[in-house]
Curated annotation (Swiss-Prot):
Protein name, per record: Probable GTP-binding protein EngB
Organism placement in taxonomy: Bacteria, Bacillati, Mycoplasmatota, Mycoplasmoidales, Mycoplasmoidaceae
The organism's place on the tree of life at top rank: Bacteria
Biological function: Necessary for normal cell division and for the maintenance of normal septation.
Record domain EngB-type G: where: 18-187
Organism: Ureaplasma urealyticum serovar 10 (strain ATCC 33699 / Western)
Name of the gene encoding the protein in the UniProt record: engB
Annotated family: Belongs to the TRAFAC class TrmE-Era-EngA-EngB-Septin-like GTPase superfamily. EngB GTPase family.
């Protein structure tokens, strides 16, 4: 059963352990909280019609991994000083959190912006996996994604196989998204175990 753990503003307030983390990030009001609740199949994240309500790093326990909800980029309806604070919160998590194994960037399939593009490009050269989740697919024509996925992928500078359409409202593809998150965590764990074995073997050979 998924549950809320804590909110944190500063890096030293984050959970201290080696649990793998999946991060969700997106513009304000793209439905991140609703999607988290859909993944949990219960209300564990606060939802609001007011953009920009998430202004801390929120941690949720999903048993095999921890889900981390970052403040929305785009910073709707906040002062310039608060914008700087939120940017710092986002940067310190994405730049320094060693538990992070993948980022799922949540976008509104109806409104893709330059902010979405800039954030997608930021993830290009990072050491963790990056996927784009197009939320609110229930509000577009059924064939919209299939007809435009190449254009959407090009606009966001990401490969088509890293795009996934969902609807938190209608629960469309939510199970598929959850399965993908668990798969990424398993693959990351396997890679780390393999790396440790190789390091141990190399160390033993040096001793000989």
């Amino acid at each position: 059963m998924a549950k809320f753990i804590k909110s944190a503003q500063y890096f030293d307030q984050y959970p201290v352990d080696k649990q793998f983390e999946i991060c969700v990030i997106g513009r304000s009001n793209v439905g991140k909280s609703s999607l988290i609740n859909a993944l949990a199949n219960e209300k564990i994240a606060r939802t609001s019609n007011t953009p920009g309500r998430t202004q801390l790093v929120n941690f949720f326990d999903f048993n095999s991994f921890r889900l981390v909800d970052l403040p929305g980029y785009g910073f709707a309806r906040v002062s310039k000083d608060k914008q700087l604070d939120l940017a710092t919160i986002i940067d310190q998590y994405l730049g320094y959190r060693q538990n992070l194994c993948a980022v799922f960037q949540i976008c509104d399939i109806n409104v893709l912006t330059n902010d979405d593009v800039e954030m997608s490009r930021y993830f290009e050269n990072q050491n963790y996996a990056h996927f784009v989740v197009l939320n609110k697919v229930d509000k577009v024509n059924k064939s919209h994604f299939d007809n435009n996925k190449q254009k959407i992928a090009k606009f966001l500078n990401i490969s088509v196989d890293r795009l996934l359409c969902v609807s938190a409202q209608k629960n469309t593809n939510v199970a598929t998204l959850f399965a993908l998150m668990k798969k990424v965590v398993i693959e990351t764990r396997q890679k780390q175990l393999l790396l440790k074995k190789e390091e141990k073997k190399s160390s033993e050979e040096e001793i000989k």
